[in-house]
Amino acid sequence: FLSLAPKSVTVKVTPHHGGFPYVTPIDNIGYQAANAAYTETFGVPAIPQRSGGSIPIVYLFEKELKSKTILMGFGLNSDSIHSPNEHFGVFNYLKGIETIPLFYQKYTQLFKSAKK
C-alpha cells in the first residue's frame, strides 16, 4: 500500500474485527413489506438505498438461520449518528413507532399469500 505518513513516522495497523457484507434483495417479501409500511406511513414509496455500517451478525443470521434480514432506518443523515452531536428527531421517532407494526402486518399478509 502507498503510505501517506512521512518517512520519519512508522505506522502499524492492527485489524480488530470484521464481518462479511450483506445486501437485502428487494424482491424479498420482507423488503416488500417494509416498503409498503413506509409508503403507508410517509405517504410516498421508499427509495432503496445501500448504506454502510458494521453489523457483522446480519450475514450470520442468513448463513445460520437461512433467513433474510430487513434493516429499517428512521434517522436522517443530519442526525450525525455516532458523533458528539448525535440526535434523533421526535417526528421520525414517532413515524418509526407507526411504521413497525405496519411492517409486521404487511409481512404477515405477504407471507400468507406466498404460501397459497
Language model features: what each stretch is:
Residues 1:
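Phosphate/pyrophosphate-binding loop motifs in nucleotide- or prenyl diphosphate-using proteins
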Residues 4-115:
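An extended, acidic, His-containing surface patch that forms the Zn2+-binding/catalytic region
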